[in-house]
Amino acid sequence: MEKNQFDQPVNVLPTPPFKGDHVGSLLRPERLKQARLQRQNGEITAEQLRNVEDEEIIRAVEKQKQAGLQAVTDGEFRRSWWHFDFLEQLDGVEAYVPESGIQFHGTKTKARGIKITGKVNFSEHPMVEDYKFLHNIAGDHTAKMTIPSPNMLYFRGKLEYSPYEDQEVFFADLTTAYKKAIQTFYDAGCRYLQLDDTSWSLFFSEDGRARIRENGQDPDELSRFFARCINESIADKPDDLIITMHICRGNYQSTWAASGGYDAVSEVIFGGLDVDGLFLEYDDDRSGGFEPLRFVNRSDLQIVLGLVTSKHGNLEDKQLIKKRIEQAAEYVDKNQLCLSPQCGFASTEEGNLLTEEEQWAKLKHIINIADEVWHS
C-alpha cells in the first residue's frame, strides 16, 4: 500500500467518509487555551488571538496528516462549543445565559444557551472564512467542515419568536437557511460536510421518549419531523458534495448525557435519511447492538462505526475492534463500513480527559486497524 512521508498508510477512497476517519473536534492546545483566556480578559486583540488559532490549526492539520487521516479538520479550535458558536451566528438567533448548564452524567456544563428572536436565515457567517482557511492548508487532503444539524436549533433554541409557534413556518425558514449555508460552504470549496446531532438521543431511551410526551409531542411524529428537516435541508446539495451526520449521546469532559440503542428510531435513521454517511457511537454498551443496522436499505450509505472511544486514552484491543466490525458486517455489507472514534475529543473547549499524545495515538490506531481490515 502507498505510504506518505511519515510512513503511515495513505487511506484513500474516491469520496469520504474514509475507511479510517474521525468526527472532527480535537483537544485544544494549552497555548490556545491561554490565548482565548487572554482575549477574554482584554489582554490581547482579536487579531492576535486569530493568529494563534491559525498557527495551532496549521499544527493540528499536520498532525492529522501524520496520523494517516485523509480528512482533516480545524479541530474546532475557533469554537468554545461544537454547536452554539455556529447557531448563534444565524440571523434571528441570539446567545443568552440560562439559569444552569446542560445536565450530563454526574456533572453539568457551564451555562450557555441560544434563543430564537427573529426570522432565521443564513447570511454573513464567520465560519465560512474559518473553512476557507482550512481549505487552503489542507493540501492534497480533504478539508472536512463540521456544523450542527438544523435539528439542534429546534432542540436547543428557546423560542421567543411567535410566528414559529407554527412548526411548519419554522421548518420552512430553518431548512431554507441551511440550504443557503450548504451552498455557501460548497462555493468556498467544501466537498465534505458533517452535520452533528444530539437530538436523536431523545428517542433512544424510554426516559427520553417520556420527556417528549411531557412536552406535548408524539415521539414517532417528532422523529419523522427531524428526518424531514434533515432531508429538506440537504435536498438541493450539489452531487459532488458529501454530507454525513454524526449522531451523539453527549460528550463533555469524558461524560455522557443519554443512553440507549438505535432500535426505537432505527427505521427512520437507517432507512429514512438522505445523507451519504452516518457516524455512529458504538464504543460501549450504552449504544446497544448492531441489529438496528438491518434497516440500512441503500448500498451507497456509508456506516462509520465509532468503536474507538474518545473519552479515555487507553487503546482498544485491535482484535476486539476487528471482531466487532465483522459482527456489524452481518447486517451491512463490509464495504459500506468505516471506522472512527465515537465522538470528537473536545466537543467543548474543556476537552475530554486524555492527553494530546493519547489523542494522536487513538487516531493512528484507527488508521492502522482500518488499513488491516479493508486494505490488507
Task: Indicate where each model-derived feature is located.
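Domain-level signal for soluble alpha/beta catalytic cores
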Residues: 1-376
